[in-house]
From Swiss-Prot:
It is found in: Golgi apparatus, trans-Golgi network membrane. Residues 577-702 are cytoplasmic. Keywords: Apoptosis, Carboxypeptidase, Glycoprotein, Golgi apparatus, Hydrolase, Membrane, Protease, Signal, Transmembrane, Transmembrane helix. Residues 491-531, 582-603, 659-702 are annotated as: Disordered. This is Pheromone-processing carboxypeptidase KEX1. Disulfide bonds: none annotated. It catalyses: Preferential release of a C-terminal arginine or lysine residue. It is a single-pass type I membrane protein. It comes from Candida albicans (strain WO-1) (Yeast). It holds the Pfam family Peptidase_S10. Its EC number is 3.4.16.6.
Length: 702
C-alpha cells in the first residue's frame, strides 16, 4: 500500500508540472527550467491572480569558452485578451548598470516596497508585449564572465549571440515583431544592436530566421556626448539656475567655448568614417556640468537641499551627490535582489551579489574604437522608426541636447527637422502630456513633468509610447492644434464605441506628410497595409485565446483525473483497513514486534534540494487529516516553512562593494549602497566612459 501511495505522489507531481502554463509552442524541456513561480509578496500583493505575469528568468550561457552568461528576466501578460506577438528588449545603461532598474523601478510589472516585497506597477509595459530585461555587458547585474568587453561593436556581437540562445529556448517567438527600448547610455547600445540585426537580416544563411525588428525607443539617450554637453550652460540659464551676473559665469563660458571647438572639429570630419580621439573622448565637455553643479550650490539651504538634482532640475539633493541619492525607492531594490531565496527563485546558477552598477565593467568599457551611436541613426531611419523620447526635467541628457544633434544630422534626404516648430500635441487620457516632432522616420518626443527616468515618473504615459510607435493612436484637432491621442489600456475601444460610427473611429491612424499616405513610417518600412497589420494582430490574438482555452480545458481534465485517482486509492485503502486481519495475513506471535519495528522506521522524502523526514504511513494520524490532505501536504510541502531550496555557500564569504547607478551617500551610515566600486575591489571616484563626473564621483548613465 505504501508503494502505491509513493507512486501516486510521484505521478501526481508529474501531472502538475506538465500542466504548468507555457507560451504557445515553447519547448517545455528547455524553457521550463527558467520558469519563475514565486517571489516575496507575489501572491499576497498582486491581485487578482490574472494580474500575475508569466515569468522566466536565469543566467543564459552564451559563450562557454569564457563562461559568459547573460541574466534575463522575461515578463508576459497572463491575460489572453491582451496577448500580442511582440517582443520588447529593455536595456539600461551605465555602462555597467543593471537593467533591473528598468524591471523594478520603471517599465516592469513590479515595484519593490520597504519590506522587500513586490507590489504592482499599473503602468507596466508587459501589457503591450513580452518584455525582456537583460543585464549586459557581462559583469553587469547578475550577468558574469571570465572576461569583459571594451567596445560597442562587441556589445552588438554579444547581444546577437544572446538572442540566438534566447530563441533556442523560445523558438515560437522567433517570428514576433521586435522592439528595443532603453535609456541613457543605452542610447549607445541600442543603435549598435539594431544596426547589427539589420545587417544580419541581409545575409542570412540556410536555417537562419530573420529577426523582425520594427523600431527602437531611446529615452533620454546619451547618443552624441560632446554635442549634448554643449546644452548644459544654456539649460541652466534658461531654467533660472544661473545668470550672466554669476561670479563664475566667465569661467563657465570659457569651458563652454573649449567644448564648442571640439564639436566644430567633430562636425568637420563627421562623415569620414574614421574614429577620432577627440570624438570618443568627452571629458572636457562633460566637465561643464561638473562645474555648474558646484558653482550653483545653495549653501544657505539644508544640507540635503543644496545641489540641483542632475536627473530632475526641480528636485534638490546634497552636494556632491546632486541627484545620486535618487530615485528614493532604489534603496529597496538592492536588498530585494540580494535575498538568497529571490536568487533561487530567479534560477541563478552563480549566486553573485547584485550591484546596480559594476565599476570594473565601466572602467573596462571605454568604447575608444567605436564611433558614437549618432552616426548610425541615418541608416537605421532608412529601415525602421527611431523614437527619441525625453523627460523635460532632465539635465544630464536633456531635450535641448537631443534636438541640437538632430538638427545637424542628415537622414532620408534632408538635414534635421525641416520645421522643428511644427509640434504635434500628445494627448493621453484627455491631458496634454508632451509634444512630438516627427519627420522621415525619426521622432522626438518631449514629455512634461518627467525626469531622466520617464517611466519611473509617468508609468502609464510611458507605456503609451508603444501605442505611438505601433500606430495605435488617433489623430485629432484638439483646441486648434494637431494632436496624437492615446488612451489608457482598453479605453480606446470604449471611446470608439461611444463615437457611434464617427469617421475613422477605431482604426489605426496613419499620419504622414500628406493625407494620401497609406503607410505609417512609425510602424515599419514594409509596404504592408495597416489593415493587414490589424488582421495579423487579430489573428494572433484569436490564436492565443484558442490556445489558452485549450490549455485551461486540459488542466481541468488533469485535475479531474487526479481527484478520481485520489478517490479510488482512498476507497481501496479504506477497504484494506476494514478487512479482518486473518484475511490479510496469518497471525503470528511476533506480529506486534514486526509492527513496532515498522512503525519505528523513518523514510526520506526528497523535495527540491532539501531532505525532510516523515513518519511512516502507519503512524497514528491527526483526527481531522484524511489521506487526501496528507498527500497534498506532501506534494505542496505546506507544512515546511523553510522554503524549497537548501542554503548555498557563498564561497569564501567575501562581500562585494556596491555600485549604485543613481546615488551615493545614503542617510544610514551603516548601509552605504552608493559607493562606486566593482566585483573585485572597493573603488571610489572612477569616471566611466560616457558619464560626467563631479568631485571624483561618477554620474552614471542608467
Amino acid at each position: 500500500m505504501k508503494l502505491i501511495l509513493s507512486t501516486l505522489i510521484v505521478f501526481i507531481h508529474t501531472l502538475l508540472v506538465s500542466a504548468l502554463p507555457t507560451k504557445e509552442g515553447s519547448d517545455p524541456n528547455s524553457a521550463k527550467k527558467y520558469l519563475v513561480s514565486d517571489l516575496p509578496g507575489l501572491h499576497e500583493n498582486i491581485t487578482p491572480d490574472n494580474s500575475i505575469p508569466l515569468m522566466f528568468a536565469g543566467q543564459l550561457e552564451i559563450y562557454p569558452e569564457t563562461d559568459t552568461h547573460y541574466f534575463f528576466w522575461k515578463f508576459s501578460d497572463s491575460n489572453p485578451e491582451t496577448v500580442t506577438n511582440r517582443t520588447i528588449f529593455w536595456l539600461n545603461g551605465g555602462p555597467g548598470c543593471s537593467s533591473m532598474d528598468g524591471a523594478l523601478l520603471e517599465t516592469g510589472p513590479f515595484r519593490i516596497n520597504s519590506q522587500q516585497q513586490v507590489i504592482s506597477n499599473n503602468g507596466s509595459w508587459h501589457r503591450m508585449g513580452d518584455i525582456i530585461y537583460v543585464d549586459q555587458p557581462a559583469g553587469t547585474g547578475f550577468s558574469y564572465s571570465d572576461t569583459y568587453i571594451t567596445d560597442l561593436d562587441q556589445v552588438a556581437e554579444y547581444f546577437l549571440k544572446f538572442m540566438e540562445k534566447y530563441y533556442e529556448l523560445f523558438p515560437e517567438e522567433i517570428g514576433y515583431e521586435i522592439y528595443f527600448a532603453g535609456e541613457s547610455y543605452a542610447g549607445q547600445y541600442i543603435p549598435y544592436i539594431a544596426d547589427a540585426i539589420l545587417q544580419r537580416n541581409k545575409k542570412l544563411v540556410d536555417g537562419e530566421h530573420k529577426y523582425d525588428l520594427r523600431g527602437v525607443l531611446i529615452g533620454n539617450g546619451w547618443v552624441s556626448p560632446n554635442e549634448q554637453s554643449l546644452s548644459y550652460l544654456p539649460f541652466f540659464k534658461d531654467h533660472g539656475l544661473i545668470d550672466v551676473h554669476h561670479p563664475k559665469w566667465a569661467t563657465l563660458l570659457a569651458k563652454h567655448e573649449q567644448c564648442q571647438k571640439i564639436v566644430n572639429k567633430i562636425d568637420s570630419t563627421f562623415d569620414d568614417g574614421v574614429v577620432h580621439y577627440y570624438e570618443v573622448s568627452s571629458s572636457t565637455c562633460e566637465a561643464i556640468l561638473t562645474d555648474l553643479l558646484e558653482y550653483t550650490q545653495d549653501t544657505a539651504s539644508e544640507k540635503d537641499q543644496r545641489c540641483v538634482n542632475m536627473y530632475d532640475y526641480t528636485l534638490r539633493d546634497s552636494y556632491p551627490s546632486c541627484g545620486m541619492n535618487w530615485p528614493y525607492e532604489l534603496v529597496n531594490v538592492g536588498p530585494f535582489l540580494r535575498q538568497e531565496k529571490v536568487m533561487h527563485q530567479l534560477n541563478l546558477i552563480n549566486l553573485k551579489k547584485w550591484n546596480e552598477c559594476n565599476g570594473r565593467v565601466g572602467r573596462t568599457f571605454q568604447a575608444r574604437h567605436s564611433i558614437p551611436a549618432v552616426h548610425l541613426l541615418p541608416e537605421l531611419a532608412k529601415e525602421i522608426p527611431v523614437m527619441l523620447f525625453n523627460g523635460a526635467n532632465d539635465i544630464i541628457c536633456n531635450s535641448q541636447g537631443v534636438l541640437s544633434y538632430l538638427q545637424k544630422l542628415q537622414w532620408n534626404g534632408e538635414t534635421g527637422f525641416t520645421n522643428k516648430d511644427n509640434q504635434i500635441s500628445w494627448i493621453y487620457d484627455n491631458k496634454e502630456v508632451g509634444y512630438i516632432i516627427w519627420e522621415r522616420n525619426i521622432s522626438f518626443i518631449n514629455i512634461y513633468n518627467s525626469s531622466h527616468m520617464v517611466p519611473y515618473d509617468l508609468p502609464d504615459v510611458s507605456r503609451a509610447l508603444i501605442d505611438l510607435i505601433t500606430g495605435k493612436y488617433d489623430e485629432k484637432d484638439v483646441d486648434g492644434k494637431k494632436s496624437f491621442v492615446t488612451y489608457p489600456l482598453g479605453s480606446r475601444k470604449e471611446s470608439d464605441a461611444s463615437a457611434n460610427g464617427e469617421e475613422n473611429a477605431g482604426s489605426d491612424k496613419v499620419p504622414g506628410d500628406s493625407p494620401s499616405q497609406t503607410m505609417d513610417p512609425m510602424i515599419s518600412s514594409s509596404t504592408a497595409s495597416s489593415s493587414s497589420v490589424e488582421s495579423s494582430l487579430s489573428s494572433s490574438t484569436a490564436s492565443a485565446d484558442s490556445d489558452s482555452t485549450s490549455s485551461k480545458f486540459t488542466r481541468l481534465i488533469q485535475l479531474a483525473v487526479i481527484l478520481v485517482i485520489f478517490w479510488g486509492v482512498y476507497v481501496l485503502y479504506a477497504s484494506y483497513k476494514s478487512r479482518p486481519s486473518s484475511i490479510i495475513k496469518k497471525p503470528t506471535n511476533n506480529t506486534s514486534n514486526v509492527t513496532r519495528s515498522s512503525a519505528g522506521k523513518k523514510k526520506n522524502v526528497q523535495w527540491a534540494d532539501q531532505l525532510n523526514q516523515f513518519e511512516d504511513d502507519e503512524r497514528t494520524q491527526e483526527p481531522n487529516q484524511g489521506i487526501i490532505a496528507k498527500a497534498i501536504g506532501k506534494i505542496t510541502g505546506s507544512k515546511d516553512t523553510r522554503g524549497r531550496y537548501a542554503p548555498v555557500q557563498r564561497g569564501n564569504g567575501n562581500e562585494y562593494i556596491d555600485d549604485i547607478e543613481l546615488g551615493e551617500g545614503l542617510s544610514d551610515p551603516n548601509v552605504d549602497e552608493f559607493i562606486i566600486g566593482s566585483d573585485d575591489d572597493e573603488e571610489q571616484g572612477q569616471a566611466h566612459s560616457g558619464a560626467a563626473t563631479h568631485n571624483q564621483k561618477q554620474k552614471p548613465m542608467n
